[in-house]
């Protein structure tokens, strides 16, 4: 089907949706909000204690939130671990998720959700082509499917799209997607659900990417920043791992920061890093993290092994459970940065950071209607994909263009008027970097993550 036909079909679908879909969600859940550089549950500081959850990995891509029986089976294990959050990398936005999301809510568990799938994502080798209206329709439909649940903690706009110096040229498109998601949430009059990015932990541009996602006008800035970190390999320590330097370098950062993946498996995992992550050594800067990963897949990071309805606990399960049981959150507010705020945009430093100005691509023209009409029904996993389909952006966005359409609601929980302190960009030898636990469907697909 030609791109023009796809666009026309989407327009027909969108025109029939004048309001957000009705979702039977729990009303007695306290949503997570952003204050300064921290998350809060009401007036109490919220630290993410979670795992990454995508049973089946790359060999059998499935939506675990649409699998009510499997979800309830695994919630029992989540509760045993003492979790309050799970991350899911791919969901089918054509399916119903009420039963699992409500069961998670009953267990006090929140969801951090990646909006992308392997077929609907930004291609780091062709970011301009893959940032199109067909792609945006898919991820907006995913927002529609989950925004009604109060235990939807946050959305990830991408995962490790930038994984080296040359791929940093895709950063404006990652930031544009983040902007568009935030604008869609506000324009559709959903509650303020944080949107951020999950970065690769690479010395070449980790700090620059963090700075970039928190610079510019409020409508362009992210609500949080996260990165995947496998640099603490037991036996280790706060200093030996280099985590002390990362805390130093991120001190003064104006957004909530957390680990979207952690848990090096080079040696026997004891999860010694848990005691540091939830201590005052780090809580002024970090808001917890997500252990990779719940189910045993080919990369051998699993806490449990799933076979049908049976779940077998592996040694790492007990190790993590013990680490969490021994580690409580700090009392009070954890010395968070109450001011928050924007920082200056990073200067171009090719080949490590190949972004030469602050300009972002404008939202593709056919996608603008979704802000007022809604995205329509999501195509789900069966959809044809968006990598080379749809209409691309043809203009540069003006500052403020990501403000809500037909709404005066605030675009962020923090303000650039209170500028964050400057971050310290480390030398490339700051700390060892261990190869992460995830691979992509293709070496060029950034956001479409497939777990192994």
Curated annotation (Swiss-Prot):
What Gene Ontology molecular-function terms does this entry list? 1,3-beta-glucanosyltransferase activity
One GO CC term on file:
side of membrane
From the UniProt record, give one GO term of the biological process aspect: fungal-type cell wall organization
Q: Where is the lipid attached (GPI-like-anchor amidated alanine)?
A: 419
What coarse category fits the chief subcellular location reported for this protein?
Answer: membrane
Query: Residue spans with biased composition (Polar residues)?
Result: 325-340
Q: Which Pfam families match?
A: Glyco_hydro_72 (PF03198)
What is the active site of this protein? Answer: 160 (proton donor), 261 (nucleophile)
**PANTHER family registered for this protein in UniProt:** 1,3-BETA-GLUCANOSYLTRANSFERASE GAS1, 1,3-BETA-GLUCANOSYLTRANSFERASE GAS5
Q: Which family does it belong to?
A: Belongs to the glycosyl hydrolase 72 family.
What's the protein here called?
1,3-beta-glucanosyltransferase gel1
The lineage is: Eukaryota, Fungi, Dikarya, Ascomycota, Pezizomycotina
The coding gene here is gel1
């Amino acid at each position: 089907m030609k791109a023009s036909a796809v666009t026309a079909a989407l327009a027909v679908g969108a025109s029939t949706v004048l309001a957000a879909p009705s979702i039977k969600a729990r009303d007695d859940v306290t949503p997570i909000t952003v204050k300064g550089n921290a998350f809060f549950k009401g007036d109490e500081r919220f630290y993410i204690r979670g795992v990454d959850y995508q049973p089946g990995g790359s060999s059998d891509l499935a939506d675990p939130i649409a699998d009510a029986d499997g979800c309830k089976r695994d919630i029992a294990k989540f509760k045993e671990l003492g979790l309050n959050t799970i991350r899911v990398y791919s969901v089918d936005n054509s399916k119903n998720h009420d039963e699992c999301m409500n069961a998670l809510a009953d267990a006090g568990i929140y969801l951090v959700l990646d909006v992308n799938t392997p077929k609907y994502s930004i291609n780091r080798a062709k970011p301009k082509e893959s940032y199109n209206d067909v792609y945006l329709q898919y991820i907006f439909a995913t927002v529609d499917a989950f925004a009604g649940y109060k235990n939807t903690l946050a959305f990830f706009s991408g995962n490790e799209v930038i994984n080296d110096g040359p791929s940093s040229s895709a950063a404006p498109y990652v930031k544009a997607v983040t902007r568009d998601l935030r604008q869609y949430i506000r324009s559709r009059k959903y509650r303020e659900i944080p949107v951020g990015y999950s970065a690769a932990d690479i010395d070449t541009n980790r700090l620059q990417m963090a700075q970039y996602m928190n610079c510019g006008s409020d409508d362009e800035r992210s609500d949080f920043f996260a990165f995947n970190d496998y640099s603490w390999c037991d036996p280790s320590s706060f200093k030996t791992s280099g985590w002390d330097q990362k805390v130093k370098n991120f001190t003064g950062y104006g957004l909530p920061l957390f680990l979207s993946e952690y848990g090096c498996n080079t040696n026997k995992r004891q999860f010694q890093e848990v005691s540091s992550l939830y201590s005052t050594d780090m809580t002024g800067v970090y808001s917890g993290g997500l252990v990779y990963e719940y189910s045993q897949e080919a990369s051998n990071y699993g806490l449990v092994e799933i076979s049908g309805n049976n779940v077998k606990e592996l040694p790492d399960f007990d190790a993590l459970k013990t680490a969490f049981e021994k580690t409580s959150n700090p009392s009070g507010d954890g010395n968070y940065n109450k001011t928050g705020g924007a920082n200056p945009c990073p200067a171009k430093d090719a080949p490590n950071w190949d972004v030469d100005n602050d300009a972002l691509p404008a939202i593709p023209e056919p996608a603008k209607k979704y802000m007022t009409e809604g995205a329509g029904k999501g195509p789900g996993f069966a959809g044809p994909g968006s990598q080379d389909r749809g209409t691309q952006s043809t203009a540069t966005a003006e500052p403020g263009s990501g403000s809500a359409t037909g709404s005066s609601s605030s675009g962020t929980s923090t303000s650039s008027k209170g500028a964050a302190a400057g971050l310290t960009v480390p030398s490339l030898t700051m700390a060892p970097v261990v190869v992460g636990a995830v691979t992509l469907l293709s070496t060029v697909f950034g956001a479409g993550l497939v777990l192994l």
